[in-house]
UniProtKB/Swiss-Prot annotation:
This is Large ribosomal subunit protein eL31. One of its GO terms (molecular function) is structural constituent of ribosome. SMART domains: Ribosomal_L31e. One of its GO terms (biological process) is cytoplasmic translation. Coiled coil: none annotated. It is found in: Cytoplasm. Component of the large ribosomal subunit. The ribosome is a large ribonucleoprotein complex responsible for the synthesis of proteins in the cell. Belongs to the eukaryotic ribosomal protein eL31 family. The gene is rpl31. GO terms for cellular component: cytosolic large ribosomal subunit. Keywords: Cytoplasm, Ribonucleoprotein, Ribosomal protein. The keyword NAD does not apply.
């Protein structure tokens, strides 16, 4: 690596270590296109998990039971096209765990996903 030039800021700590909560709309339909009927809902759960790992940068992802019920609400074949989720990056209380942070994925019930964008949610 080249030495830092005069006037350049030094890199601070990574934003991945911050505790943060965001709401996303996931287009499940495009992620399970071409998947066989009996594997659609299980694949949707796997794709939501993959999305959370990519967005939050934590390999430890925990999916809420309400989100699981929402994905399975129309059966194994007819998964909802879009689903609104809240991704919360949290500190791991378990000391012997290899990961300092984990991501909790919860379901956000909405009537329609039209016009919704990714938003940061304030911690309450």
């Amino acid at each position: 690596m080249a030495p830092t030039k005069k006037g350049e800021k030094k890199k601070g700590r990574s934003a991945i270590n911050e505790v943060v909560t965001r709401e996303y709309t996931i287009n499940v339909h495009k992620r399970i296109h071409g998947v066989g009927f009996k594997k659609r809902a299980p694949r949707a759960i796997k794709e939501i998990r993959k999305f959370a790992v990519k967005e939050m940068g934590t390999p430890d992802v925990r999916i809420d039971t309400r989100l699981n019920k929402a994905v399975w609400s129309k059966g194994v074949r007819n998964v909802p096209y879009r689903i609104r989720v809240r991704l919360s990056r949290k500190r791991n209380e378990d000391e012997d765990s290899p990961n300092k942070l984990y991501t909790l994925v919860t379901y956000v019930p909405v009537t329609t996903c039209k016009g919704l964008q990714t938003v940061n949610v304030d911690e309450n």
